[in-house]
């Protein structure tokens, strides 16, 4: 299963749409959003891709009720999880949380194969040694909106566990 991981879209519909569009062309089957959507309507353009979008909120969250209602609309692709989400997809245990320090702590537990975060706008792919003797991947896609650093997202394959940080088409480099 191929994934598109984004975070910190900060209402930038055009760059969010560009990232998800490119990821779908590359074969993405699902989108994970690690928060700071701001206005829930910023996710509406993602409907066109027909991919499930799992989203949590961050510290820049607009109307959570509107987000909940958007997810309840008929044929909605939005799955709103609140402040964090534990998912099982492609045979992997995934956790989405906005803050990197929580993500690091969760990765250390060994309870998750992949822990994803955002918030600091710094893209990173790290392997974390867990307390159970294995390892977990800690993924931070940076900011898809290009607020501060370049606009970026992560494209990955859950089967091969290969992930790459990609520049968003049309975003600053």
Kindly give the residue locations of the regions a language model identified:
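N-terminal active-site segment of His-dependent metallophosphoesterases
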Residues: 1-49, 64, 68-69, 75-76, ...
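Active-site metal-binding loops of divalent metal-dependent hydrolases
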Residues: 7-10, 35-37, 58-61, 99-101, ...
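Glycine-rich phosphate-binding loop signature in dinucleotide/nucleotide-binding domains
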Residues: 23-27, 89, 108-110
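Generic beta-strand structural signal
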Residues: 33, 88-89, 156-158
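Short acidic, glycine/proline-enriched helix-loop-strand junctions
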Residues: 41-55, 133-136
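Helix-adjacent hinge/juxtasegments
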Residues: 50-99
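Conserved beta-sheet core of the metallophosphoesterase superfamily
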Residues: 54, 93-95, 99-168
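A short acidic, often aromatic-flanked loop/helix-cap motif at beta-alpha or helix-coil junctions
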Residues: 85-87, 146, 171-173
């Amino acid at each position: 299963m191929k994934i598109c991981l984004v975070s910190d879209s900060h209402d930038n519909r055009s760059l969010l749409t560009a990232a998800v569009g490119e990821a779908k062309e590359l074969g993405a089957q699902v989108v994970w959003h690690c928060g700071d959507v701001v206005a829930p309507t910023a996710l509406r353009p993602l409907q066109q891709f027909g991919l499930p979008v799992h989203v949590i909120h961050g510290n820049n969250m607009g109307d959570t009720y509107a987000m909940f209602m958007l997810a309840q609309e008929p044929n909605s692709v939005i799955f709103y999880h609140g402040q964090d989400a534990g998912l099982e997809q492609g045979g992997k245990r995934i956790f989405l949380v906005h803050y990197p320090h929580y993500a690091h702590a969760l990765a250390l537990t060994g309870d998750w194969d992949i822990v994803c975060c955002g918030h600091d706008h710094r893209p990173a792919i790290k392997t974390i040694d867990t307390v159970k003797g294995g390892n977990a991947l800690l993924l931070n896609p940076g900011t898809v909106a290009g607020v501060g650093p370049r606009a970026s997202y992560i494209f990955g394959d859950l089967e091969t566990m290969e992930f790459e940080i990609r520049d968003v088409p049309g975003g600053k480099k």
